[in-house]
């Protein structure tokens, strides 16, 4: 992979508790761990003032492949942004091949919850839990590469001695809509009955236009 890459960005609004809503935006980035001392951040464009500002990210965790996940949360989301990584006297960028990444500010302000999403991988698990009835529920984001697609998980509760597939259903599309330089993101929801008190692992796969893409959490699989 490149020295730095966006994983995902999201923005929306949440209730303030006083009858109004507060804006939020979250950014998740993966970098090659080229040295201990490094600076990772988001350059965001303010649609109101037309200015660009730098927002540093914080280290989140290490993952296989000598990679690290960094993230940051802001209030008002930028309408455009790039990712910068400074290390060993070098500066690396992920600026969407020079076109910048875009978020839909109107959709963010008008949505209770997440209203606008950008993802860089073709498929990415974002939330999962086992509910009280023993159902594994997984939320997955995919790039809308083509209309016909299949989103699913493969899971096990016995350390891969046996495994099963569970297929997802389309839930919603996020703004901004697809453009020549940034495909739109869709949310798919997957449910599987694993049993009350069960633990295990899963990975996500996305089949579209004759190709299958995987998210296996950098080779670790996801645990539940």
Regions found by a protein language model. Name each.
Residues 1-224:
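Glycan-association/targeting regions that enable binding to alpha-glucans and other polysaccharides
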């Amino acid at each position: 992979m490149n020295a730095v890459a966006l994983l995902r960005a999201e923005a929306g609004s949440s209730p303030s508790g006083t009858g109004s809503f507060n804006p939020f935006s979250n950014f998740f980035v993966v970098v090659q761990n080229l040295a201990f001392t490094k600076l990772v951040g988001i350059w965001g464009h303010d649609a109101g003032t037309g200015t660009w500002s730098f927002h540093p990210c914080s280290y989140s965790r290490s993952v296989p492949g000598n990679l690290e996940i960094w993230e940051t949360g802001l209030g008002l989301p930028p309408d455009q942004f790039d990712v910068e990584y400074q290390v060993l006297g070098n500066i690396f960028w992920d600026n969407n091949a020079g076109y910048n990444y875009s978020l839909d500010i109107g959709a963010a302000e008008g949505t209770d919850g997440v209203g606008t999403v950008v993802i860089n991988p073709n498929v990415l698990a974002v939330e999962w839990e086992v509910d009280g009835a023993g159902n594994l529920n997984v939320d997955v984001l995919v790039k809308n590469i083509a209309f016909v697609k299949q989103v699913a998980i493969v899971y096990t509760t016995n350390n891969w001695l046996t495994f099963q597939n569970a297929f997802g259903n389309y839930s919603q599309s996020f703004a901004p809509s697809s453009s020549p330089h940034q495909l739109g993101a869709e949310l798919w929801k997957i449910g599987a009955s694993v049993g009350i008190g069960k633990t295990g692992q899963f990975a996500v796969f996305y089949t579209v236009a004759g190709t299958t893409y995987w998210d296996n959490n950098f080779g670790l699989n996801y645990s539940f």
